A protein has these predicted regions:
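Short, well-ordered, aromatic-rich surface patches in folded extracellular/luminal domains
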Residues: 454
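C-terminal substrate/ligand-recognition segments
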Residues: 364
Length: 486
């Protein structure tokens, strides 16, 4: 049921109290850390997880922690890291696990999960008369065969639709998939070196027959610019496919009508992170809304790129108009080659929240644009600050980590009716400080679903604690706002 319009002719958006918790504790297993992808398909909600994010981070990334928030064995693969797909039925408020990644023999000759997680999920139906298909993009361990695109027509059986690595590429993960003009587009996102965000193959791929694994490249490597380390996000908007990159000098945004013969002609719309530079490192989210394409930025690693010594810095929000011009909505005012840009919302980067690392996902529902963030203050009390910038530690060292956790931590969810005026729905992870990020949002006939990133399970080390104890608030969560908005 839709809510009535107000005197301004606007249907009210959802508030915090409209959201009901429908899954918690990682579906009963705190190892399910991220509700990493989500889709509405054939009358059900599908949610796919990534497991054991903190143990995997410790094993592969140079992140300085005095103590890790959760138990991290020396070999993370001694844990159950087999990613899962869950299905929700609204009518009886029930969940069913419909898929679990199989164990295979890795390149080291030992059993290993085929998938650590599922970073993308999309419904593809090229023609109204065609049977809709659910595609899921996977994250493969480095000693696995490579990422796959899984395909299902019934929501229960998920079969590989391509060869490992999409077309045999030496990569570990595929993040984004976009149906556009009757075709499916995707791109690799991770390398064998352990970084899930930097690809050795920054190319857009297209398929007119993804069910049979027929893929071809339709762009030059990095659009001809070596600084584009990865094509990170894509979206269709009006007549163009838009692509956002990962670039240490600042992300770029390119677009193409994807017509004629590939490789298609591509036009650069935004350069050098909209002239903010490296603090706008990558495009995390893209979403079309009321005649514009909205662009959410960020810095890999949750806003602090320790590998490249970038950040910490909160993200900006932009929007691109059909003529290729752009507005700064949330961010730092500055002079640019296309004139002075001031944030039209009045908000500084991160909605005035220094600990905001990403503008992670966006979704339109019932006339409102909803935006979820990633917020990293929950790890502040565990981090080794020896290599942090002096200016930064001079501020942080005056803060109590417990006070920050109690009063600051948790993702934010904002909504806007016009892209310029933003209203907070929650700024504390829906009352759970361990909900670091809002990773998934899906609009459906039943309402708006949101899924969280919460790697603080199944056991965690309390701040100033001496041992790991069960965390009833650890593991990903899913919420539904249904019926009339408050």
């Amino acid at each position: 049921m839709k809510s009535p319009m107000n005197r301004l002719g606007i249907r009210p958006g959802f508030n915090k109290d409209d959201f009901k918790l429908i899954a918690q504790g990682g579906f009963g297993d705190g190892m399910n850390a991220y509700a990493h992808s989500m889709a509405w398909f054939n009358g059900h909600l599908y949610v796919a997880t990534t497991r054991g994010n903190f143990p995997l981070m410790k094993a592969r990334l140079p992140i300085g922690m005095d103590v890790w928030p959760v138990e991290c064995p020396e070999n993370p693969f001694s844990l159950d890291l087999q990613a899962e797909i869950w299905r929700y039925t609204v009518a009886d408020d029930s969940w069913e696990r419909v898929s679990k990644a199989p164990l295979i023999i890795g390149s080291h000759g030992k059993p290993i999960t085929r998938e650590l997680g599922y970073r993308g999920m999309v419904v593809y139906q090229p023609k109204p008369s065609d049977t809709p298909m659910l595609f899921v993009s996977t994250w493969s361990p480095a000693k696995g065969p490579g990422p796959l695109l899984l395909r299902s027509v019934d929501g229960r059986n998920f079969e590989p639709s391509c060869e490992p690595g999409l077309v045999g590429l030496p990569v570990t993960t595929i993040r984004t998939m976009v149906p556009f003009k009757g075709r499916l587009f995707t791109t690799p996102a991770g390398s064998r070196g352990g970084n899930t965000n930097v690809s050795a193959h920054s190319v857009v791929y297209e398929s007119r027959d993804p069910a049979n694994g027929q893929w071809e490249p339709v762009s030059d490597f990095g659009f001809g610019e070596a600084g584009n380390k990865t094509i990170f996000e894509m979206a269709g908007f009006e007549d163009h496919l838009y692509v956002g990159t990962f670039n240490l000098e600042g992300f770029q945004v390119w677009r193409s009508t994807v017509e004629s013969k590939p490789p298609y002609q591509w036009e650069k719309i935004i350069d050098r992170g909209a002239y903010r530079g490296g603090l706008n490192q990558c495009v995390l989210s893209m979403y079309p809304f009321k005649g514009a394409l909205y662009i959410g930025g960020g810095i890999q690693g949750g806003g602090v790129d320790t590998q490249n010594r970038v950040g910490p810095a909160p993200p900006e929000l932009l929007r691109i108009l059909p003529d290729g011009s752009w507005d700064l909505l949330v961010g730092e005012g500055r002079d640019t080659p296309v004139g002075r840009k001031e944030p039209l919302s009045g908000y500084l980067p991160g909605f005035d929240n220094f600990f905001c690392g990403y503008f992670w996902r966006m979704c339109a529902h019932d006339g409102w644009l909803y935006m979820g963030t990633f917020e990293w203050s929950s790890v502040l009390g565990y981090a080794n600050r020896a290599r942090w910038p002096e200016v930064f530690t001079g501020i942080i060292n005056h803060l109590s980590p417990q006070s920050v956790l109690d009063n600051q931590s948790g993702f934010s969810l904002y909504r806007s009716h016009d892209g310029e005026n933003w209203v907070p729905v929650t700024t504390n992870g829906m009352d759970n400080p361990y909900n670091m990020g809002l990773r998934t949002l899906v609009s459906s006939p039943q309402g708006l679903f949101i899924g969280t990133a919460n790697p603080f399970g199944p056991k965690y080390m309390p701040l100033n604690g001496t041992r790991y104890i069960p965390n009833p608030r650890g593991g990903c969560e899913v919420f539904l706002a249904q019926g009339n908005a408050a």
